[in-house]
Amino acid sequence: MSGGLDILSLKEDDITKMLVATTHLGSENVNFQMEQYVYKRRADGVNIINLGKTWEKLVLAARAIVAIENASDVFVISSRPIGQRAVLKFAKYTDTTPIAGRFTPGAFTNQIQPAFREPRLLVVTDPMTDHQPIMEASYVNIPVIAFTNTDSPLRYIDIAIPCNNKSPHSIGLMWWLLAREVLRLRGTISRSIEWPVVVDLFFYRDPEEAEKEEAAAKELLPPPKIEEAVDHPVEETTNWADEVAAENVGGVEDWNEDTVKTSWGSDGQF
């Protein structure tokens, strides 16, 4: 499909990313409709996915997304926790509508409920866990794009992108590649320049592991410096009462020394 155009061909750097993220490793079971995407079967029973066909389907899915005039009419869905962060990041960079977490039954078919939506295209992370929106999309003729493993059912799925959708790194990488290809087809970014958004932003992070990393980072920090108390010389305080000379106060008259008159008369007699 993209083999005729060299500009759309799979690059070596992208192949390396897929191999490191174990995108090529499928499950031990194979759905009969997914046999065309299986390259071979390993001795331990794990099926190897053909990454060339994975890339062709990814480019086809990106072209379908770009064909929608209003990007908000494209709904990206992930009920599994490992794909919720990738879905939110994809929606942020492509202006699509995310549904991360539990899907409300009847959102595409029940016009009475407030959560009713009418999307024009769905992109789901796993056909098994996201079976409810896929089923409702089939009732109202909404095309569906899905990341599928070797054992995923392809019922009501229009474009299947074969990959390892059970690995957090693999599913994060696939959403990152799809977002980059959508932006390239829109002309937002150039193919000659590397996309500055790193793929790590699309990876799922376990909350417990994130807390452990933060705690380990705090332990590596140097301890805060404690300022030692400096002994300053204590100045001698002087008693101002001693320096001030006592003022000489005049003699105090004793009022008892005055002669007490015993009569109201002029001579003092009764």
From Swiss-Prot:
Record text on subunit structure and interactions: Component of the small ribosomal subunit. Mature ribosomes consist of a small (40S) and a large (60S) subunit. The 40S subunit contains about 33 different proteins and 1 molecule of RNA (18S). The 60S subunit contains about 49 different proteins and 3 molecules of RNA (28S, 5.8S and 5S). Interacts with oho23B/rpS21.
Residues in the signal sequence: none
UniProt entry keywords in alphabetical sequence: Cytoplasm, Developmental protein, Nucleus, Ribonucleoprotein, Ribosomal protein
Protein's UniProt name: Small ribosomal subunit protein uS2
Gene Ontology CC annotations of this record: cytosolic small ribosomal subunit; nucleus
InterPro entries linked: Ribosomal_uS2 (IPR001865), Ribosomal_uS2_C (IPR032281), Ribosomal_uS2_CS (IPR018130), Ribosomal_uS2_euk (IPR027498), Ribosomal_uS2_euk/arc (IPR005707), Ribosomal_uS2_flav_dom_sf (IPR023591)
Chief subcellular location: cytoplasm
Locations listed in the record: Cytoplasm; Nucleus
Entry keyword Amino-acid biosynthesis: no
SUPFAM superfamilies documented for this protein: Ribosomal protein S2 (SSF52313)
Biological process annotations from GO: ribosomal small subunit assembly; translation
Originating organism: Drosophila willistoni (Fruit fly)
UniProt similarity note: Belongs to the universal ribosomal protein uS2 family.
